[in-house]
């Protein structure tokens, strides 16, 4: 099983030695200008109702560019040399440096002092920092948190400048109701009347099977859908599995059909050849085994991707949710489709629950298609001044780091999940 890991396209030594500003601030300078940065007013991480794609977010991000330009002009911050797993109760000289680092971006009140003790104030500051960077807010200093802390201030400034340009490209009318999929954040937002209605953790495309940036329309919800296995998965996964376990298809409710639509029994196929690639493999409905779970959300587009439920709910609690073959898995999918179908006659929450309970194949075309924007935003801010950063997981920022604090994926507990990742 893979654990959380950090991988950099540039070495850690290069980050520390070559990328930081030549003049880093002293502790006194940091504390002095941090008073003007109003860190104390923003120690907590509020739940903003401002959509990532909105005029308000654009204006806030433009303002944050100026703030980070000021940070850079004042010398940025020192690289943090600290052991991983520092937590409440620890005493270490690195905690003093950690306090100074958190003060600069407003995650810790300067009044918290310069003690080498990792107290509850430092823990709260670390949690706030982690939340702003898409990390699990444990309050413990781990490798991923240290890597994010050590991204140089000029890099963060460039990241903000790049994303202002991206946000401006969405400055037109996006619609009365729309959906945002922010790929680097692995996050889905439903937006209505300019406010976020719901937020959902998501599973998005792997680094080598990227989710596309696109604008499209959601047209229908398929309940208890079939899943047609892609040809690449038949070749790479199903054939080897059947060679090892002839009962595999039956146990996973996967059926074989000829081009004429005739069902073929598994024992009729020569699994020691490529004969299987000539057939269609279809997994029966059933949220417990079907790779799309109980729901597929149709989005006609040239990439052949869609949104769906998943039987692998555990991914939503992980930092690293770049696990699919390009499609987007949605947490709390019932809340999501209830919102999608709210203006479609006869599709209230009660009816949706009845369809789930019945387990029957049912399609629900939306009476009004909903716009959906799959976007790539790695830095943005809210009007309250809270700035968010995410790893440049697909290396679209071009700042020299594929993922500055990438959290490695957790291998599926069930090995059969590995091939059912859409």
Where does each model-flagged region fall?
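A short acidic/small-residue loop/turn micro-motif
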Residues: 15-18, 204-205
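Proline-rich low-complexity regions
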Residues: 18-19, 212
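Well-ordered beta-sheet/strand-loop patches within structured domains
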Residues: 25-110, 114-132, 136, 143-422
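Sec/Tat signal peptide C-region and signal peptidase I cleavage site
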Residues: 20-24
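N-terminal secretory signal peptides and thylakoid transit peptides that target proteins
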Residues: 1-14
């Amino acid at each position: 099983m893979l654990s959380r890991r950090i991988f950099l396209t540039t070495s850690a030594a290069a980050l520390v030695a070559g990328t930081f500003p030549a003049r880093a601030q002293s502790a006194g300078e940091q504390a002095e200008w941090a008073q003007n940065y109003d860190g104390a007013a923003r120690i907590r991480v509020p739940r903003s109702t401002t959509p990532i794609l909105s005029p308000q977010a654009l204006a806030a991000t433009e303002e944050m560019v100026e703030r980070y330009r000021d940070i850079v002009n004042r010398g940025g911050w020192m690289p943090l040399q600290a052991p991983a797993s520092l937590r409440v109760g620890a005493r270490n000289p690195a905690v003093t440096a950690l306090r100074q680092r958190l003060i600069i971006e407003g995650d810790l009140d300067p009044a918290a002092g310069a003690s080498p003790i990792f107290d509850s104030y430092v823990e709260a500051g670390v949690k706030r920092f982690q939340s702003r960077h898409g990390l699990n807010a444990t309050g413990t200093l781990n490798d991923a948190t240290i890597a994010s802390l050590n991204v140089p201030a000029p890099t963060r400034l460039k990241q903000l400048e790049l994303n202002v340009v991206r946000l401006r490209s969405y400055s037109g009318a996006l619609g009365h109701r729309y959906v945002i999929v922010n790929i680097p954040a692995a996050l889905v937002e439903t937006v209505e009347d300019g406010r976020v209605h719901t937020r959902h953790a998501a599973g998005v495309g792997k680094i080598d099977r990227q989710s596309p940036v696109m604008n499209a329309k959601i047209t229908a919800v398929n309940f208890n859908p079939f899943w047609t296995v892609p040809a690449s998965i038949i070749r790479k996964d199903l054939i080897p599995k059947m060679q090892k376990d002839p009962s595999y298809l039956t146990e996973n409710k996967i059926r074989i059909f000829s081009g004429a639509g005739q069902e073929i029994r598994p024992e009729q196929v020569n699994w020691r050849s490529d004969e299987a690639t000539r057939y269609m493999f279809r997994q029966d409905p059933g949220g417990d085994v079907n790779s799309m779970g109980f729901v597929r959300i149709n989005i006609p587009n040239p990439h052949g991707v869609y949104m769906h439920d998943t039987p692998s709910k555990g991914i939503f609690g992980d930092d690293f949710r770049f696990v699919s073959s390009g499609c987007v898995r949605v947490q709390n999918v019932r809340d999501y489709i209830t919102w999608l179908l709210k203006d479609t006659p006869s599709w209230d929450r009660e009816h949706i629950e009845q369809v789930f309970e019945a387990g029957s194949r049912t399609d629900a075309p939306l009476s009004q298609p909903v716009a959906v924007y799959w976007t790539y935003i790695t830095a943005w801010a809210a009007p309250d001044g809270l700035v968010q950063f995410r790893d440049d997981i697909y290396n679209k920022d071009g700042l020299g780091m594929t993922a500055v604090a990438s959290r490695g994926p957790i291998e599926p507990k069930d090995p059969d999940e590995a091939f059912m990742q859409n």
